[in-house]
Amino acid sequence: MPRVIHFEIHAQAPERAVKFYRDLFGWEFTKWPGPQDYWLIKTGPDGQPGINGGLIQRRGAGPTGELPVIGYVCTIDVPALDDYVKKALTGGGTLAVPKMAIPSVGWLAYCKDTEGNIFGMMQADPKAA
């Protein structure tokens, strides 16, 4: 069956978004040498489960608070959800959905990045209730 192999973040201010995600998750960004502003994103070591992605200049207006999510929301596995939510807020992000328990799975929260994009963060915890 087909699998997701790549994700893409659209940004009004790409440099600001690169800094946000680099500081928050330690992701590596490499400017693509092609004709458009595009950054390749490496989210972890080769051989570790997960996918890599890209970041591109947004074409058109950014999302507003009144719009529902249009597109897919990526959720990032983190070791300490509370710490990462604090890092996201300190880095210029905002809280979209507060921390909640997913029983027997873990803890989940949703944030918005500096560009208004929503992303999830989850801490595995089989005792979450």
Model-derived regions: residue spans:
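N-terminal beta-strand motif that seeds the catalytic metal site of vicinal oxygen chelate
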Residues: 1-19, 71-76, 123-129
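Short alpha-helical
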Residues: 15-16, 82-83, 106
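Conserved hydrophobic/aromatic beta-strand scaffold that supports enzyme active sites
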Residues: 38-40, 75, 108-110
